[in-house]
Amino acid sequence: MKIYITGLPSGYEVEHLVRLFYPMAPLTLTPPEAGEDCVWAEKKPDGLWAMVRQGDKCAERSAPLPAPAEAGGETPEFSLASLTYDLLRQWTGIRPPWGKMTGVRPVRLIHDKRAAGWSETDIDHFFLERFDCSEQKYQMAKAIADLQEPILKVGSAPKTYSLYIGIPFCPSRCSYCSFVSCNLDRDRKMVQPYVDCLCNEVKEIRRQADKAGLTLCSIYIGGGTPTSLSADQLRQLMGTVRQNFDLSKVVEYTVEAGRPDCTDAEKLAVIKEYGATRISINPQTFSDEVLAGIGRKHSAQDILDCYAEARKAGHDDINMDLIAGLPGDTVESFEHSLRQAIALDPENITVHTLTLKRASRIVIEDQRENDYADVAAMLEKCRLLAEAGYRPYYLYRQKNTLQNLENVGWCKPGHEGYYNIYIMEEVQTILSAGAGGSTKLVADGGKRMQRIFNFKYPNEYIQRFAEVLERKKGVADFYDHDLGPKASG
């Protein structure tokens, strides 16, 4: 199946709506040949037209051009995308649970509509009728928006910010992963120089934040796998954070402990001693067979042992990640993983849906052995979380996620992950340290934004570190002027 779009300056919306039905269909720039399987969408001078062809069967739809936008009409691209969606929904018999919505932040959309003065009835119509969103997904997004409102008031206070620190090292690469990360065994010599640079960047961030008059709200150390650092390197990094920031005023300090094959009692003790208030231990699954298949070098028992060590070290706010749709997983084994996580009684459980990243081994080696019809059934099992007293508190979506589904953070009341909410709803500045870091500067209630990018790869980050520090001066400049300097990537 190929995608061919013509007559528009950009076919972005059409392409991504087609991929709700055919996730891996390539976009072609030349018209399909006669008899070739394809979805063809075209804006013609006198109207819109869409066609789908598979084998010897074909269907098509047409519609007049929309009224001009200034007269209240839709854009031609959205109208063509809607026409194509309606055709493919009838053709395949599939109703995507989020309908025509391709955006990654549906909860943010609810916040924006409320802020713009829309009535709840108008918002309901927007989601359910215009975008064909299912009642179940919309009600979940709406409940999350309600829960987030008081938390967003804290995070959206003028000149508040969160600090993100990235550790791009892992003991091994998971098959579903496309993030920039380095193999610890291969790149071990790079780790200490990287940590040294990272500590200096943290100090520069504090200086720039002070110049701009910013107040730190939350801290998140993520990866990669932060516990791929040694205990001494964690002390060095977290000690630098403690020396440069008043942690007593921080509402949340998260460290992704991540994988049990590099997280031990000493590291867990260091993380607690140096001020972290929340950690994440991420099993992804409790099936040994699935763990082996995705390239994890540990067992389900290792996860249980790591969790017990974390509790022993005094960690009282723990998140656990699970992924629905991993190769080799089934509805039954996913339910087992979910029940196992609930039995451990962590404060947070985050359920991700597998995303098909083109740079991941799953896609490169075509390991997509699930037919994905079971993925929605896996997520239906999340009712077990609600029954156990957890409630959804943040939600986001990604391109090429199986069945156009979502990632949802669940928590016990009072244990919402503040940083997760702030970064997803884009209400505050995020100052990022480390390779691949993307600093996002926010002012005027989100009306003005700017990004400053760090170099993507750790070796380049180290070699060109002077440029990293120079770019950070754009933080204070952004708040001193109407427009900050542009940052090249």
Please annotate each region the language model reported.
Residues 88-95, 115-163:
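N-terminal [4Fe-4S]-dependent radical SAM core
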Residues 214-215, 219-223, 233, 401-407, ...:
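Amphipathic, soluble alpha/beta structural segments
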